[in-house]
Amino acid sequence: MKNSPTKNFHILLDRISLTVPEQEAALNRAESVRENLMNFSLVQECVITGSMARSTAIRTFSDVDIIAIINDDPKMMENSKLAISAISDYLARTYSSIEDFDSAVHITLNDGPGIDVVPAFIAGKNTSGHSLFKIPAEQRSWINYDPAGQDQRIEQLSLQLGDEFKQAIRLAKWWSRANGSPIPSYEIEGVMSRTFLKWTEMPTPPEALATFFREADANKPDKVTGHGKSVIRKAALMAQDALELAAQGDTAGSMERWRCLLGEQFPTVVF
């Protein structure tokens, strides 16, 4: 389509995507933390996972996730906060900037993305034979987590649909961060996978993002709040409006809508 916003989306993707050296440096720093954790008697094994490992991370906002598989402990199984505290106390011996959350211990680093250390118990196997975990959740509880299954779904769809699939995930994550994070990063990957599961090729970036919004609005992820639902509905309507304006030849109007959704990093120049 002449003068479509697609080129503008590619410029945004260049701005928000980590370069290969940046990604490798982040994973190397995570490996150093992983090796440190392996010296902690509570920890059995550590696995580097998450968006950085899956190449769906975005600049500025994405961290590296480390699953720290811990020894079975009845008290910790009843109260996930005890596991968080134990990991935090150990990491504080080495790292100066530590913050505890319900689900992870966050390490802030000055030279790149931070690291989230997530304590976990092994909870069985998924259908492919990979480990399932219990990880901390709100109110000191534990929830199921299947990182290997998520990795497999993302890679299968990336092979099926090309690099454009992961690009669409990055765009959706950037939108979420620019709008108060109505959908958690992990849920965004799930919605995107469900949206394009049966597609044979990806649409253009603006069409892919609008399709994602429609699916997220129709089948909202479990963790989306009432306010988040409103944000998603607004995004779905505005994205559809942006597509219609582009189809009518109003490229400038279309890009103004996308800029409202994606923030100031989205360029509005008409090519």
Predicted segments, located by residue:
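A short, glycine/Asx- and small/polar-enriched loop/turn
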Residues: 60-64, 111-113
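Short hydrophobic/aromatic beta-strand micro-patches
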Residues: 67-69
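Conserved catalytic core of two-metal-ion nucleotidyltransferases
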Residues: 81-128
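N-terminal regions immediately upstream of nucleotidyltransferase
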Residues: 1-48, 53-61, 74-78, 107
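A generic structural motif
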Residues: 71-76, 198-200
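Generic non-transmembrane alpha-helical segments
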Residues: 29-42, 86-94, 171, 175, ...
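Conserved nucleotidyltransferase catalytic core and NTase-mimicking acidic/glycine-rich helix/loop elements
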Residues: 160-271
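A structural motif
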Residues: 130-172
